[in-house]
Amino acid sequence: MTSETVDPPQLNTIRIEVDGEIGTLTLDRPDAFNAMSPEMIGELTVAFAWLADRAPLRALIVTGAGRAFCAGGDVTWFRKGVEEEGIDLPSEVRRGAEVLHQAIVDLRRIPYPVIAAVNGPAAGAGFSLALACDFRIASSTAFFAPAYGRIGASPDGGMTYFLPRVVGPSRALELLLEDPNLKAEEARALGLVSEVVGADELM
């Protein structure tokens, strides 16, 4: 890691702020509930790689702008791409998943604690991103949803790796099959979050 002072990269869908030894990464597509577009997924790899190389930092907070943590993959973007641009959906989804998986690997390489401050819905890939953090603190307005079954997809973003390690294999399978919306207190009871706080106390 380098200890030199370098300004964070300027990205379109993500904000990185550094305050002393604490970094904050904010998913910044509030109008889309911070859903992951291909651009955001690519920028996550840039952001996490930069953060992993910052020696002065001692902790990183990952959160979302507005009312959501992250609504998962941007299904609206994919639908529009198919209808208006004729993209090959299976190929685009596969490519996006590969980049997302690299972003999760880059996140796990960060050599200091990463805390997910879950300020609202964390669904699909957003749930996966929260699980990939070292631990999670949730707003009382947050909820967690696997969501993949609702679109006929298998979980990605590391969910099948992290979820069984957090809640146990049997409960993880139950959550993936039943696909509930877990309220913050329910998530705490399962061990998914360490603490639930008021919305005005989270950040």
Predicted regions and their residues:
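Hydrophobic alpha-helical membrane-association signature
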Residues: 40-43, 96-99, 202
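Histidine-centered beta-alpha loop that forms part of the nucleotide-sugar donor binding/catalytic region
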Residues: 28, 73, 119
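Glycine- (often His-adjacent) and acidic-residue-rich active-site loop
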Residues: 64-103, 122, 150-152
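Residues at the N-termini of beta-strands
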Residues: 24, 59, 68, 135, ...
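Crotonase-fold acyl-CoA enzyme core
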Residues: 105-203
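Hydrophobic/aromatic residues within transmembrane alpha-helices
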Residues: 25, 62, 74, 129-130, ...
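Conserved CoA-thioester-binding segment of acyl-CoA-metabolizing enzymes
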Residues: 1-65, 105
